[in-house]
Curated annotation (Swiss-Prot):
CDD domains: RuvC (cd16962). It catalyses: Endonucleolytic cleavage at a junction such as a reciprocal single-stranded crossover between two homologous DNA duplexes (Holliday junction). It is found in: Cytoplasm. The gene is ruvC. GO terms for biological process: DNA recombination; DNA repair. This is Crossover junction endodeoxyribonuclease RuvC. Binds 2 Mg(2+) ion per subunit.
């Protein structure tokens, strides 16, 4: 399936720094960069104010660049609990901003993105930056790392979108076939039940019209 022209917004979620990017799919595996940047919120501000700023900034990007789909990193953090919570808050705001605009959201783990971009699910940030710079034909490496990560997410979705669509279509086709089979099975059962009922009715009518061989015939009146 051709996804040429698909515009993807990649987001590397974070409350202090949130990487944003927009790319557009070309033919084959060609991807064109549209924009890249980072949204920052002051660490000394109230959580609600930081989330509001993030939501407004990301919303402006979505409105200005009109992406077709959003790709967000699915973060698995085992470190500082506070950092984990802040990132989770940020992800919630990002998904909400997309939902308000009717934009579908796809989430990818860091290893999925690394595998798609470099072929190595354990590639380090330097390797990823080199690869994304080469893939997009950039004159210089995107900075900071959050921006490079956002671009990698967007490119990852461009390359995986055809596979996701084929998988989704296969699932829809299988569900359609399952329903067709259930419908045919239901009709077959109904037909079989109708035949069985007709057979039972016919047998009953036959028995009613013919005396049993064990029944004694009426004796003639001796008079």
């Amino acid at each position: 399936m051709n996804h040429e022209g698909l515009r993807v917004m990649g987001i590397d979620p974070g409350l202090t720094r949130c990487g944003l990017s927009v790319v557009q799919a070309g033919r084959g595996r060609t991807v064109y960069p549209v924009s890249v940047g980072v949204v920052r919120t002051p660490s000394d501000a109230e959580l609600a104010d930081r989330l509001l700023r993030l939501s407004q900034a990301v919303g402006e990007w979505m409105d200005d660049y009109t992406p077709d789909v959003i790709a967000i990193e699915r973060v698995f953090e085992r470190g500082n609990v506070s950092t984990v919570m802040n990132t989770a808050h940020a992800v919630g705001v990002l998904i909400l901003a997309a939902a308000e605009r009717g934009l579908p959201v796809h989430m990818y783990t860091p290893s999925e993105v690394k595998k798609a971009i470099s072929g190595n699910g354990r590639a380090d940030k330097k390797q990823m930056t080199v690869m994304i710079t080469r893939i997009l034909g950039l004159a210089e490496a995107p900075k900071p790392a959050d921006a490079a990560d956002a671009l990698a997410l967007a490119v990852c979705h461009c390359w995986r979108a055809p596979l996701l669509m084929r998988t989704r279509m296969t699932a829809v086709d299988l569900e359609h076939r399952r329903r067709q089979y259930q419908g045919k099975l239901g009709k077959a059962k109904s037909t079989l039940n109708a035949r069985n009922n007709a057979q039972v009715t016919g047998d009953a009518q036959v028995r009613a019209g013919h005396p049993s061989q064990f029944e004694r015939p009426d004796r003639a009146d001796p008079r």
